[in-house]
């Protein structure tokens, strides 16, 4: 591989490798050169024919190594079947290193090339599945500066987290993005982005990924990878397939700039449709209808208590009782259910400082509440945040007093 950490290393590496590439090209094979790693793709109608081609090309590689005074890594040199159903029970391929000296190349079912994990049959499932572990480890390292109660503000933490992990996840998406048409691929990316969003949102672990995505305003990462893959194909003039959001006819009749805008519009349309039909995050959906809202709003930085109301998940008794964490779902005011809507709109404990009109909450004819007006302006949103924080402070104060009285009388 290319020496790491030096300025001139890659240039010198390219110069030294050029001789081997010229010899390989002269032997009648197509050469596609990438810095750092070397891969030889051999094809044939039988396994014996494939091994013969590999043998010829590896002999060139070994001779080049002897000439340059370097050795080929036996540990990293492996072979794998990318297509076809040749017998691989032997799990090794013999190639001639020198005259009458043979080396066995280990057969593997998965290898990492240029940062992408490739499996037999040209599959990328392992690459996508591995993202969850990779992202989780990275998030743990960043938690010291991304605390919930102190540290970077929302905008900065979002920028750091998204800027750190999205490029890692979407790297080389144009090669493997078709894996995302399968549920396991989408679930793997969803699990990865969940770690990142949880690190910069004041939410309970029980909040759905769909709701977190809307609260951050981040395009779901499977759609982000689809978008980047489509933009890459548009810029390179590559043929589109049924999974892509633009068609070949549109590519032929539109400019690159218009196509990039079209790709962006359509992936957001897909996200909006998902949010409308989803069964998850329905409390959040009563406040935020447009998935682009959080991404556009500079003032939307909900704290812990506000997020509890926007998601319906938190320390309220109705939520805790449903999960067996509270003996009763009742409110201290005497109501049978202390849920988010009760606290925000009906609880008599907070009646003295509640003003639904100022918060943008509308009472419908049937007695139900409409909350889309809450986020229609900074004024209504600010009034709601002010009310929620004041209500939670009073609630905690009353709970402490009641607990103290129980301790005294107990």
Curated annotation (Swiss-Prot):
Catalysed reactions listed for this entry: DNA(n) + a 2'-deoxyribonucleoside 5'-triphosphate = DNA(n+1) + diphosphate
UniProt domain Reverse transcriptase: residue ranges: 1-118
Record-listed E.C. numbers: 2.7.7.49
Annotated Pfam families: RVT_1
Ranges in a coiled coil: none
GO molecular function terms attached to this record: endonuclease activity; RNA-directed DNA polymerase activity
Keywords: Endonuclease, Hydrolase, Nuclease, Nucleotidyltransferase, RNA-directed DNA polymerase, Transferase, Transposable element
Annotated region described as Nucleic acid-binding endonuclease, given as residue ranges: 254-410
PANTHER family linked to this entry: 115 KDA PROTEIN IN TYPE-1 RETROTRANSPOSABLE ELEMENT R1DM-LIKE PROTEIN-RELATED-RELATED (PTHR37557), CCHC-TYPE DOMAIN-CONTAINING PROTEIN (PTHR37557:SF4)
Protein name, per record: Retrovirus-related Pol polyprotein from type-1 retrotransposable element R1 2
Species for this entry: Nasonia vitripennis
């Amino acid at each position: 591989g290319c020496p790491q950490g030096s300025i001139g290393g890659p240039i010198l590496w390219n110069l030294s490798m050029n001789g081997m590439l010229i010899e390989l090209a002269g032997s009648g094979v197509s050469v596609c050169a990438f810095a750092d790693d070397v891969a030889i793709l051999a094809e044939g109608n039988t396994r014996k024919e494939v091994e013969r081609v590999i043998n010829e090309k590896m002999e060139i590689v070994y001779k080049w190594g002897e000439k340059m005074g370097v050795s080929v890594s036996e540990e990293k040199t492996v072979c794998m079947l990318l297509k076809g159903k040749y017998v691989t029970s032997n799990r090794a391929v013999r190639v001639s290193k020198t005259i009458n000296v043979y080396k066995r190349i280990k057969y593997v079912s998965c290898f990492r090339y240029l940062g992408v994990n490739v499996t037999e049959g040209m599959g990328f499932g392992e690459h996508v599945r591995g993202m969850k572990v990779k992202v989780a480890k990275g998030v743990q390292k960043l938690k010291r500066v991304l605390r919930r109660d102190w540290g970077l503000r929302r905008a900065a933490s979002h920028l750091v987290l998204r800027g750190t992990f999205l490029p890692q996840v979407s790297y080389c998406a144009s090669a493997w993005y078709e894996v995302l048409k399968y549920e396991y691929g989408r679930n793997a990316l969803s699990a990865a982005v969940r770690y990142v969003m949880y690190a910069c949102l004041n939410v309970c672990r029980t909040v759905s990924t769909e709701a977190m995505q809307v609260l951050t305003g981040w395009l779901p990462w499977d759609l982000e990878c689809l978008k980047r893959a489509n933009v890459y194909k548009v810029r390179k003039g590559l043929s589109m397939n049924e999974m892509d959001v633009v068609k070949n006819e549109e590519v032929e009749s539109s400019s690159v700039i218009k196509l990039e805008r079209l790709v962006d519009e359509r992936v957001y349309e897909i996200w909006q449709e998902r949010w409308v039909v989803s069964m998850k995050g329905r409390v959040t959906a009563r406040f935020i209808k447009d998935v682009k809202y959080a991404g556009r709003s500079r003032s939307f930085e909900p704290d812990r208590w506000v997020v509890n109301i926007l998601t319906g998940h938190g320390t309220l008794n109705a939520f805790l009782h449903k999960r067996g964490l509270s003996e009763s779902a009742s409110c201290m005011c005497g109501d049978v259910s202390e849920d988010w809507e009760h606290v925000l709109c009906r609880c008599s404990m907070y009646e003295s400082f509640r003003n639904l009109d100022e918060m943008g909450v509308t009472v419908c004819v049937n007695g139900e509440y409409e909350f889309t007006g809450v986020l229609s302006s900074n004024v209504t949103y600010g009034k709601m945040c002010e009310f929620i924080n004041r209500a939670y402070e009073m609630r905690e104060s009353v709970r402490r007093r009641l607990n103290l009285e129980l301790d005294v009388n107990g």
